């Protein structure tokens, strides 16, 4: 009778362990479903999420191996019904393994929470980068508008330079006395043209360069006006001399 009672106790413990194993399996399946639901978000997260997936997969494999060991232990317990003491020791081993499985499942739950946190952090970083991109696009658009205004001013200055150059060239035949001044003016105009071309490729300094060029052009136009006045005076002197010669 004592042996039968021991066997009955063993069977009850086996049934209790089987129930614990079923519950562990249900919990594992529930965790697996949650993990499947999070996979799509984890794929979009950073590289740590991929590493975390590998760790979760290892945990799942360990859980499968633990379930196989539990099934083996249950089979050994069924074969050990004639040896109650041996069965008792086997049950203790199974209890220890079941506790380890529960600890592993708790670890798996913590890893799942960590994966969710990483995915949320990745989403937050993406939104922050998107906001910065919108700000940079606005600044770029304003910079392009300033560059267009500078290019228009440069075009106007080029036209003015062409006009000044044409006026200077028209005075080349007026008098040999002013050829040296005209060469100097042409050299200055060429220098200004080179500076103007350089200003077109450096939009950020265009406004200051345009201001300097405008002042220089005003100075050149003033010098040109003086040259014209001197040329008129020269012609008047020549005409007066010719009149005096004719009178003689």
From Swiss-Prot:
Modified residues (N6-acetyllysine): 177, 215
Phosphoserine PTM sites in chain numbering: 6
UniProt key word rRNA-binding: no
GO molecular function terms listed in the Swiss-Prot or TrEMBL record: actin filament binding; identical protein binding; metal ion binding; protein heterodimerization activity; protein homodimerization activity
Disulfide pattern: none
Additional remark text: This protein can span only six actin monomers.
Free-text comment about domains: The molecule is in a coiled coil structure that is formed by 2 polypeptide chains. The sequence exhibits a prominent seven-residues periodicity.
Protein family membership: Belongs to the tropomyosin family.
Biological role: Binds to actin filaments in muscle and non-muscle cells. Plays a central role, in association with the troponin complex, in the calcium dependent regulation of vertebrate striated muscle contraction. Smooth muscle contraction is regulated by interaction with caldesmon. In non-muscle cells is implicated in stabilizing cytoskeleton actin filaments. Binds calcium.
This protein's name: Tropomyosin alpha-4 chain
